[in-house]
A protein has these predicted regions:
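Membrane-interfacial amphipathic/re-entrant helices at transmembrane-helix boundaries
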Residues: 1-21, 49, 60-70, 97-101, ...
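Single transmembrane alpha-helix segments in multi-pass membrane proteins
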Residues: 4-53, 85-101, 239-245
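Transmembrane alpha-helical segments in multi-pass inner-membrane proteins
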Residues: 18, 68-77, 200-207, 217-284
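Membrane-embedded helix boundary and interhelical linker motif in transport proteins
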Residues: 31-85, 89, 265-273
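Hydrophobic core segments of alpha-helical transmembrane domains in multi-pass membrane transport
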Residues: 47-52, 75-82, 107-117, 154-163, ...
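Alpha-helical transmembrane segments within multi-pass membrane transporters and channels
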Residues: 61-109, 116, 250-255, 259, ...
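Transmembrane helix-bundle core of multi-pass membrane transporters
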Residues: 93-94, 99-168, 195, 261-280, ...
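Helix-loop-helix "hairpin" substructures at the membrane interface of multi-pass membrane proteins
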Residues: 143-221, 225, 245-251
Length: 307
């Protein structure tokens, strides 16, 4: 029972991070119908920027909360600037192009970000200095740290704030109107370019925060870390129903639970043939199953259009 509960705790924490990243995919897809495969690499940039700031301030007289706050702010500013720039330079000129063109462009931007990061930070893993030691608690035989609690609560708070913003503010209503019909929204006086830029801005900010969370959780950063993370977050968005904000939240949490439970029990289920390092396979197995049996996702609406 304690192993099961432990995997549930780990899965919820991991899933909350996936959900934050998945929101970036689903918001852009909802507005533009574009799969922004560069989003995972924006998360990577945020993580490496945060690591750089933390390493620079580690050992100084600056308090740890200010170090983490400064690292998060720097990551958000860099990622938001990159996100808006990518939208303006790479995606906006292709808005009326065939759907394959922006998709290929997104993959190209992803590769560009990866190798630019490799030039700036090298291809080596970058370790997080031990700036704090998380306190550990025991619940029904399972352990949980204050860092895990902080990550989960912060992620849930950010997701709830985004849902409230989209539902109750004028800008949020403009985003929903643009998602439903951009042409009609433009005729009603909504600045479509501004809404699209804000969508990239919000998604990039959430991605930067997710990158900081990953660095704190795993203690490592790498120029290639955004690739697998991005695919998993995309899987979460598809699982929940891409284009649906609450679907991305649900999909992220479910994917985290599936991955964590698979990691905990795969050895027993396969007689030791497969280890926990095969847990990534389950994320992509989920993607295949969802695309075959429920391509609209758990909360998405079915459509007659076929790829």
């Amino acid at each position: 029972m304690d192993i099961f509960l432990q995997q549930i705790i780990n899965g919820l924490v991991l899933g909350s991070i996936y959900a934050l990243v998945a929101l970036g995919y689903t918001m852009v897809y909802g507005i533009l119908g574009l799969i922004n495969f560069a989003h995972g690499d924006l998360v990577m940039v945020g993580a490496l920027v945060a690591l750089t700031v933390i390493q620079a301030l580690f050992g100084s007289a600056v308090p740890v909360p200010l170090i983490l706050g400064g690292a998060t702010l720097a990551a958000m500013l860099i990622c938001m600037t990159l996100g808006v720039t990518i939208e303006r330079v790479a995606y906006r000129p292709l808005r009326r192009a065939p759907r394959l063109a922006p998709l290929i462009t997104a993959i190209g931007v992803s590769i560009l970000l990866q190798y630019t990061a490799a030039l700036v930070w090298s291809k080596q893993y970058i370790s997080l200095p031990e700036i704090f030691k998380p306190a550990q608690y025991t619940i029904a035989g399972a352990s949980i740290t204050d860092l895990q609690i902080f990550i989960f609560v912060l992620a849930c708070g950010l997701m709830a704030a985004l849902l409230w913003f989209i539902k109750h503010t004028l800008l949020g209503k403009a985003m929903r109107a643009t998602e439903q019909n951009a042409e009609v929204a433009g005729l009603m006086g909504i600045d479509i370019n501004r809404i699209v830029a804000l969508t990239f801005l919000f998604g990039s900010a959430l991605g930067a925060i997710a990158g900081v969370m990953i660095v704190l959780y795993y203690g490592l950063g790498h120029y290639y870390m955004g690739f697998i993370l991005g695919l998993k977050a995309f899987t979460a968005a598809v699982l929940g129903g891409i284009g649906k904000v609450h679907g991305a939240v649900l999909g992220g949490l479910l994917l985290g639970l599936i991955e964590s439970l698979a990691s905990g029990y795969i050895g027993d289920l396969t007689g030791g043939v497969l280890g926990s390092n095969y847990r990534d396979v389950f994320a992509f197995l989920v993607l295949v199953v969802v695309l075959v049996f429920r391509p609209s996702g758990l909360v998405g609406e079915t459509s007659g259009e076929r790829a």
